[in-house]
Amino acid sequence: MGDTAPPQAPAGGLGGASGAGLLGGGSVTPRVHSAIVERLRARIAVCRQHHLSCEGRYERGRAESSDRERESTLQLLSLVQHGQGARKAGKHTKATATAATTTAPPPPPAAPPAASQAAATAAPPPPPDYHHHHQQHLLNSSNNGGSGGINGEQQPPASTPGDQRNSALIALQGSLKRKQVVNLSPANSKRPNGFVDNSFLDIKRIRVGENLSAGQGGLQINNGQSQIMSGTLPMSQAPLRKTNTLPSHTHSPGNGLFNMGLKEVKKEPGETLSCSKHMDGQMTQENIFPNRYGDDPGEQLMDPELQELFNELTNISVPPMSDLELENMINATIKQDDPFNIDLGQQSQRSTPRPSLPMEKIVIKSEYSPGLTQGPSGSPQLRPPSAGPAFSMANSALSTSSPIPSVPQSQAQPQTGSGASRALPSWQEVSHAQQLKQIAANRQQHARMQQHQQQHQPTNWSALPSSAGPSPGPFGQEKIPSPSFGQQTFSPQSSPMPGVAGGSGQSKVMANYMYKAGPSAQGGHLDVLMQQKPQDLSRSFINNPHPAMEPRQGNTKPLFHFNSDQANQQMPSVLPSQNKPSLLHYTQQQQQQQQQQQQQQQQQQQQQQQQQQQQQQQQQQSSISAQQQQQQQSSISAQQQQQQQQQQQQQQQQQQQQQQQQQQQPSSQPAQSLPSQPLLRSPLPLQQKLLLQQMQNQPIAGMGYQVSQQQRQDQHSVVGQNTGPSPSPNPCSNPNTGSGYMNSQQSLLNQQLMGKKQTLQRQIMEQKQQLLLQQQMLADAEKIAPQDQINRHLSRPPPDYKDQRRNVGNMQPTAQYSGGSSTISLNSNQALANPVSTHTILTPNSSLLSTSHGTRMPSLSTAVQNMGMYGNLPCNQPNTYSVTSGMNQLTQQRNPKQLLANQNNPMMPRPPTLGPSNNNNVATFGAGSVGNSQQLRPNLTHSMASMPPQRTSNVMITSNTTAPNWASQEGTSKQQEALTSAGVRFPTGTPAAYTPNQSLQQAVGSQQFSQRAVAPPNQLTPAVQMRPMNQMSQTLNGQTMGPLRGLNLRPNQLSTQILPNLNQSGTGLNQSRTGINQPPSLTPSNFPSPNQSSRAFQGTDHSSDLAFDFLSQQNDNMGPALNSDADFIDSLLKTEPGNDDWMKDINLDEILGNNS
C-alpha cells in the first residue's frame, strides 16, 4: 500500500510540479509564478510527505527487519536515547536501517552504523541516531575538516553496496526500489528527492552537529533534529534543501556549519537545495547520492528535473502560459492544494527569504515533528522547499507576502525563516529576540517589497508581457497599473486579461473590463462574469494571472475591485484599442503614436462606416419593400447621420481620453502587448470596432453597465466574426451606448442591413413562404386564439390582465408603430446585424409565438419588440424601445434570411444573442423591466445579469414582428386580443414602451409585416423546428404557452402543422438557430418562438410573462438560471389541465439537463 501509494504521490507531486513548473514558468508574472511554484512546492511537499510516510511505513517494516538484524542495536540506542523522537527516530532509524539495508544491507552500511554507533555513543541523538551518529561522526569529521572525506568515505561505502543492491532492486523492483532508495532518503525524510540515506544522515548529523555546535547541545539538537529531522524527513522537500544546507553546514564546523548552511542556501538558488544535486555541497553526499541513486538513477533524474523545474519557476524563464492554461492549472492546483492556498502567499513570502530556506526546510520537515513549532508551521510553508529555493528569484515578490510569517513566532519564524530569519540553517539557534527582529525585518521588507513590486513589478511584468506581449501571457497584463495601460491592454484580443492582470489600481477596473473584452474569445460567460462581479472576473481570468497575485492585494485587489467609474473612464480608451486591430498586441511601443494611428484609423473607419452605412441603407432599402425602404431610409439616414456624428464625437473623445491616459501612463501601457490581448476575438472590422468604441464609450462613461457593454462588444464581435454580412458588433455596442446608441445602433443596423442584403433576399423568398404559412397559421390561430385566450385568462388572469393592458397600449400605438417602423427598421437592422442569430432565433420564435398566439401574437409580438428593446436596456431603455422595436421588426424581416445565414453561424449562439440582446434586449429589457419590474424583475434581473435576457428581448422583437404580420392579416384587434390573453403578457415589462411600440408595430405590422408576415412564419418554423415540432408545440403549448397556453397550444400546434412545411425550409434555420441559441434546449423549449427566444433571451420571457415565461423559459433552458425550478414548477402547476398534453411531450431530462 504505502509502497505503491508513495510512488503515485511522488509521481503526482513531481509530475504535477514539473507540469506546474512549466505552466508556472509560462506564467509571466512573478506573482502567479510564485503562487504556482508555491502550490507546486506544497503539492510536492505533500506528495513527498505522503510518499515518505508510505515509504517510511514500507521501509519501516523492511528496515526494521534488516535494521534490526544489522542495526537493531543502533535502533534500540537511537529509540531509547531519543525518546521524543522515538517515533520519527524509529522511522528514521528504520529508514536509516532500510537505507543501510537497501543501500548497504551488507556490513558496509553496518560499518557506517558502527561508526554512527560510535558517534551515537559520542552524540546522544539515536532516533535518527544512526543518521545522527553517522552524521555527527561526519560532523565531527567535518568539524575536523574531514566531513567530506568521512561522508565520502563512509557514505560512499554504504552507498556502494547500496548501489549494488539498489541496482539489483531497480532491475528487480524498479520504481519500488526507487521508493526504497527514496525511503532511505525519507528515512532521512529526504527520499522524495531521492537523496541518499547517508547524505541525509550526514545532513542530519551535520545538522545535529550544527545544532550541537550551535550550542543547543547535541542531545537537544538531536532531539529537536530527531524531531525536526524526522519531521524534515517526512517533509522530503525540506530534506533536499536541508541536505544541501546541512551538507554545507557539515563543511563548516559548529556555527560555521550553520553559517555555511545559510551561505550555501543563499548560494543555492534554492533550486539545487531542493534537488539532490545540492547534496554536492558535499561531494561525498553527491557520491553517496549517485551511489544510492546509482540504484535510483530515476530518483536522481527526478531531482535534477525538479531542480530544472524549480529553476525555471524561480527564473520564470518558462514561456508565458495562456490565461486558460494558467487558469486551469491554478484552479486545479487550488482545488488539489486547497490546504496550501493560504500558504501559497505565505510560502511565496517564505520562499522569498532564501537564506532561511535551510531552516525552513528543517522546520518544514519538522512538520512530522510537532515538537518543533517550526515543523508544523513551517511544513506547509516549507513544502515548497524543493521549489522554495527556486523562489529566490521571486523572493522580492514573496517578501511582500512575508508579513504573513508574523504568524505566531513559532510559525512565523518558519515562515519568516523562509523569508529572512530562517537564513540561519539552525533556526532553533536563533534567539527569540533575533527571530522577532527577523520577523519585523521580513515584514518591513515585505512592505517595501509590496511597494516596489507594485511600483516595479508592473514594469517588470510589463517587461515580461512586453517580451511575451503578443503572447497571451496574462501576467504581463498585471503591470497595467495605469488606466491607459489597462485600457490599451483592453485590446480586442487578449488585452482584456492584461487589463486585469496589468494595472493594480486602474487595471482593477480595466482588468474587469479587460476580462469582459477578452471573454469574447472565451465565450459569453466571461461577459457575464464581467457584469456579475469582479469576483467572477477573478474567478475567470484573474485566477489565472493572480492566483498567486491575489495574496498580494496591492496588485491583485485593484484588478478584482470593480470600479464602474474607473472602468467607465478607462474603458473608452480600452474600447478604441479594441477597435484597432493594431491594438491586438500592445507592446511597449509608443502608445501615443498608436493612439494617433488609431484615431486616424477610427476616423477612416467612421468614414468608411458612414459610406458603408449609406451603401447598406441603399442595399437594404432596395432589398426591402418600398415602405420599409422609405422608413428605413428616413430613419436610417437620420440615425446614421446622428450616429456618425456621435461616433465621431465619441471617437474624438475616446481618442483624447486615450491620448491623455496613454500620455499619463505611457510606461504602463507597453504591457498592453499583453499576450492575453489575443484572447479577444479576431479583430473586428475597423468600422465595427469604431462603432463598438463609440457605442460602448458613450454608455460606459455614464452607464454602470460598462461591463455588460463590453460583454456585448465581445458578443458583438463574435457576431461580427460569425456573421460576415453584418458588423453586428457595432450595433451591439450602439445599444450599449444608450439612447445615443440608438442612433449609432441604427446606423450600425443600416450597415448590418446592407451586409444582410443576401439574407434579406433569402428572407424575401422565405417571407413569401411564411406569408402563406402565416395565413394558414393565422386562420388556425384565429380559431384557436379565443380558446387560448380563455385558457390564458383562466389559467392566469393577472398576467392576462396585464396583457390586456399591453394590448390596449398596442392597439393605440398602432398608428405610432408605422411612424416608429422606420426606427424599428433601423432597430431590426441593428438586431439583424448584431443578433442576426439571436434575432433570427427571435424572429422565428416570434413567428411561432404569433402563430401560436394567433391574433394575440401581433400584440405580443409588439410587446416582444418592446422586449427586444431590452438590448438597449443598459442605455436608453425607453428610447431604445421604439427604435429597437422597429429595428427588431426589420430584424425579423431580415432574420429569416439572416437566420438562415447567421443561424448557420452557430458561433453566434450566445454572443450574437447577447450582442443583439444587448442592443435591443437591453433597452427593451430595461423598459420591459420597468413595466414588468414586478413580474419580470426576478427573471429580468436574471436576464439582466445574464446574457439570455438580451436574447429574450430579441425574441420579443421577433414575436413582435410576427405580431404586426398577424395584426395586418388578422387585424390589430385580434392581435391585441390574442396578445391580451397570451401575447401582451409576454412584454409585461414594457407596458409604456411596449404600447407605443406595439402601435407602431401594428401600423407598420400591417404594412411592413404584411410583407414580413412570411418571414415570421419562416422564423416561426425554425423556432418550432428548434425542437421536434410536435414536442416544441406541445411542450411550449403546455409550458411556454403558459400565459399563451390556450392560444399557444393550438397556434403552436397549427404552427407545428404549418411548420412541417416551414420545417423543411426552416430546418436549416432551426438547426443553425439551435446552434445560435447557445442553449439548444432553449431552442426546443423556446418552441413558441417567443418562448424559444425568451428562453434564449430569458430576459424577454421574464419581461413578457414571468408566469408563462417560467414554463416557456424552463422548457427552453429551464430558465438557465433566470427561471428557478420553483418558477418552472409554478408554471407547470398553473398550466391548465387542458394543456397537460404538453407535459407528456416535455423531456424533463432535457429541461433539467439544460437547466443544470
From Swiss-Prot:
Keywords: Activator, Chromosomal rearrangement, Notch signaling pathway, Nucleus, Phosphoprotein, Transcription, Transcription regulation. Residues 113-122, 440-470, 588-630, 706-725, 733-743 have a biased composition (Low complexity). Its main location: nucleus. GO terms for biological process: Notch signaling pathway; positive regulation of transcription by RNA polymerase II; positive regulation of transcription of Notch receptor target. SMART domains: MamL-1. Widely expressed with high levels detected in placenta, salivary gland and skeletal muscle. The modification Phosphoserine is found at S175. Residues 153-165, 344-354, 371-380, 393-419, 428-437, 484-496, 532-543, 563-587, 807-820 have a biased composition (Polar residues). It holds the Pfam family MamL-1. Signal peptide: none annotated. It is linked to A chromosomal aberration involving MAML2 is found in mucoepidermoid carcinomas, benign Warthin tumors and clear cell hidradenomas. Translocation t(11;19)(q21;p13) with CRTC1. The fusion protein consists of the N-terminus of CRTC1 joined to the C-terminus of MAML2. The reciprocal fusion protein consisting of the N-terminus of MAML2 joined to the C-terminus of CRTC1 has been detected in a small number of mucoepidermoid carcinomas. Interacts through its N-terminal region with the ankyrin repeat region of the Notch proteins NOTCH1, NOTCH2, NOTCH3 and NOTCH4. Forms a DNA-binding complex with Notch proteins and RBPSUH/RBP-J kappa. Belongs to the mastermind family. The C-terminal domain is required for transcriptional activation. Acts as a transcriptional coactivator for NOTCH proteins. Has been shown to amplify NOTCH-induced transcription of HES1. Potentiates activation by NOTCH3 and NOTCH4 more efficiently than MAML1 or MAML3. This is Mastermind-like protein 2. It comes from Homo sapiens (Human). The gene is MAML2.
